[in-house]
Amino acid sequence: MMGIGSKSRGRLQRAAAHVAAKGAVAACAIVATLSVAIAVEVGTANAPPASPATDQAPPEEVVVEGNHEGPRMWRVAKGDHTLWILGTITPLPRKMTWQSDSVEALLHETQEVLPAWPSIGVGANPFTAIRLYFTWRKIQKSPDHTKLQEQLPPELYARFSALKARYAPKDNKLDELRPMLAGGRLLDDALNVSGLTMRNEVQKEVLKLANKQGVKVHQTKMKVEDPVDVLKDLGDTPKDSEIACLAAIVSRLETDLGPMQARARAWALGDVDTLRSLPHSVDDRIACLAAVSTSERVRNLVIKAQDDWLIEAEDAMARNKSTLAVQSMDRLLGDDGILSQLRTKGYIVEGP
């Protein structure tokens, strides 16, 4: 039997590496799904409803100039140990300038920084990466391979199409995706056109400042033991739940892009009163979380990540005089939010 030549072997290795890289993309999809789910807290559902949007898209950039207090923090204390929590919001403008002076000053007295969510890993096995890639490709479309127009109620499809024409006119693949993925992709397109991003650039800047000052960053690690099965579970999401997710995203894009921009400016200025008064819709995240949470496997991962963060925050307080944490305001506030849970446990909580 003839052996494989060096050129053929090289081609096979490059092909395997390419597929493994695509598997990493699928792994990122799991991480993104869990990160969004972890950030959702239904306590914000009582926020003022969003008002109808105008025909104007939000401006490309929010720049906050001059001397302002900047983003505000909550103080959680027990004895002489203090946990400072910087509440963040999403989305934020890609090019937003915000005052980080208070964070920099606090880092001089802080022993540890706690990020908002765990580091979610799926392992580095190349065979797992390949399986992830092919599973991810398989679940991109609905099981019956029907297009969105055939799956959605006519009224919802008309609204979806109007938003697509405005924010993603050249994205011809949107109609081929399953409802939940189509909704997520349309949201990304709309935010991009509006100069917004769901990436936590604030946390990125805080961690950069912490590293610069030599402050320890303690991020919990959560390994997904069965990432292929998680993707399969996402692929088995009931169609009705997926359509509800897409419908909530459509409603948010129709009403909330302007308020998103106003919230970003209020956050950067540290204007908590305005931030609290502005419309804030989380219906899309709640609906999409409900969709992916039909999987017990995904639901348990989300619950574990949320519980682990609170445990880590309390542990950090116990071992440090001063700890700085970053956390979504969606998770902080509300009757069932993190701050309420800490109060129940006997901690002193002071708001901005």
Each language-model region and where it sits:
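Bacterial N-terminal signal peptides
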Residues: 22-37
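Boundary at the C-terminal end of the N-terminal hydrophobic targeting segment
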Residues: 37-52
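N-terminal secretory signal peptides that target proteins for export/translocation
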Residues: 1-18
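A cross-kingdom marker for long, charged
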Residues: 288-352
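Residue-level recognition of short, well-ordered coil/turn positions
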Residues: 24, 271-272, 321
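Glycine-centered signal
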Residues: 3, 18, 37, 279-283
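Structured, acidic catalytic/metal-binding patches in enzyme active sites
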Residues: 49-65, 70-297
